[in-house]
Amino acid sequence: MKAPIKKELMKCFDRELEARWPQFVVFESERDARTWSWKASPSLVFFVTVQVLEGKEQFLVEVSWNEIAEFPWGAMGKVKVESSQGRERLGRLWESGPCEPVWDVLPEKTARQVQDLDAVRQGKSIPADLPFAQIQPRIMPLVRDAMDKFENYGIPLFRRVAEAHGITSLATGRD
């Protein structure tokens, strides 16, 4: 993902999380991802991660938990709520097919990638990307859609995890 798009994407996620779920705070930031955490109890931490896809103008969201304040790196694909840790891509909570849902800032570019690759192989030029000023207005609606999906799929998962860990009341900031 191009740097200006990624910067705007993360700013939008910061704003949306602060507005919707202020209990999440930045946990760590890596080259292609940013993670927020919420210590729901002394023995349960929830995480939300936004990961940009390398070489594409796309991103995905992950939800995870751990009984200690460490990111559960080895828990991908584990969503048994009674487990000490779990981690899954948000899109996998509603989609089970071979294609994983991602959010695409430039779907027209994604659609033409095969043609662009063929053009490069043949020594032809490829269309330039839109200017950032035309891309920027697309970002917040995608972030809001991702946060709506988080509210509809991620938060209910976190509630089930909390209940399985003996937490009877989980104030999510939207209650």
Q: Model-found features: residue ranges?
A:
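Conserved acetyl-CoA-binding loop of GNAT-fold acetyltransferases
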Residues: 22-26
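Intrinsically disordered, low-complexity regulatory regions enriched in serine/threonine/proline
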Residues: 1-14, 27-175
